[in-house]
UniProtKB/Swiss-Prot annotation:
Function: Catalyzes the decarboxylative condensation of pimeloyl-[acyl-carrier protein] and L-alanine to produce 8-amino-7-oxononanoate (AON), [acyl-carrier protein], and carbon dioxide.
Protein family according to the UniProt entry: Belongs to the class-II pyridoxal-phosphate-dependent aminotransferase family. BioF subfamily.
Residues recorded with modification N6-(pyridoxal phosphate)lysine: 241
Name of the molecule in the record: 8-amino-7-oxononanoate synthase
Record GO terms (molecular function): 8-amino-7-oxononanoate synthase activity; pyridoxal phosphate binding
Quaternary organization: Homodimer.
EC number, UniProt record: 2.3.1.47
Known cofactor(s): pyridoxal 5'-phosphate
Residues annotated for substrate binding in this entry: 21, 135, 355
Organism (species): Saccharophagus degradans (strain 2-40 / ATCC 43961 / DSM 17024)
Binding positions for pyridoxal 5'-phosphate per the UniProt entry: 110-111, 181, 209, 238
Pathway: Cofactor biosynthesis; biotin biosynthesis
Amino acid sequence: MSLESELQKELSSRKAINRYRSRRVALSPSGVRMRVEGETKELIAFCSNDYLGLAQHPKVIEAFTQAARHYGVGSGASHLVNGHSQEHHQLEEELAAFTGRPRALLFSTGYMANMGVINGLLGRGDAVFQDKLNHASLLDGGLISGAKFHRFRHNDCEHLNTQLEKSTAARKLIVVDGVFSMDGDAANLNQLAASAKKHNAWLMVDDAHGFGCMGENGKGVVDACGLTLDDVPILMGTLGKAFGTFGAFVAGSETLIEALIQLARTYVYTTALPPAVAAATRASLHLLETEHWRREKLNALIQQFRGGCEALNLQLMPSQSPIQPIVLGEDAVALNVSKKMAERGFWITAIRPPTVPEGTARLRITLSAEHSEQDVEQLLNALAEVMREVSGELQSE
């Protein structure tokens, strides 16, 4: 059978079950208010990961512009050839200081960081233990590593302990999201750290959604839990969310970072981030550490939204993060609600399996410090109207 016919069959199958994904073309910069191709009016976006609203900050843009004038657009090669600029190096040092760790290492994307770390540290004869709701990049890293792959029930440390007790692997790595990207809840890091120590395992935390939003000065979930390098030897963070730029990093000991420079194939065999992105991230890191009002405002908006949903009897997940999903169940219902919200001026993406478990399609609502109280109030009013309308449609079927 030809490639074309096989792929057409796959695409048709996805369309038939409401799993076909498509892109929308933005006509304006990423922000709270966006113009989108096919829409006659501006949409208020409640689906971005720009949690602190730094992506369009004038100081971040200026840092990027100045560095681009000096370094040009591309880095030219990998970090180990001639692509490692002073901007990269200084950003790594500043991220290490920010996380309170001896060293940090930049990666081009969060996906590459997770793949590189897990594959660099594990192989045949080892074992990796992952929360069932971990991000795809963590799961893929574990599957490709060749290590024995275990998945424990979400935030269930007893289940994890049972798996660890049975393992005879030479190296054992526990891997979790700090804040789970689709549910918005946090990992039980204190219990996980205790389990790791008890069973002589290593703990890796992907705090992509915690950095900037949680902990003292936005230092993340690990910091919020009072854990140290000894508890969490491998800490990963992304730069494309609260930092508002692009890329990722891993922070840890001198030995860990030197080992990853040698062993992480996704670091060794790829072009370095543009120096201008590193310069912009240095500016956003400074803002993240000094403009505390952004986190304070974001947290106030989160509480406003959760209180409003409670008043409307809309059930939310147990999340205190900017990620506030409303689980709707069926894929078609989630798509319908997303469409109706767009008609009322809101851009909220419907998230469907396999990104989330079967039967848990949802609106993944995310809040930003750039939103206003009025934006959230308008969102709640629109949700109330749409949910009444959809409920009536379902009852009449």
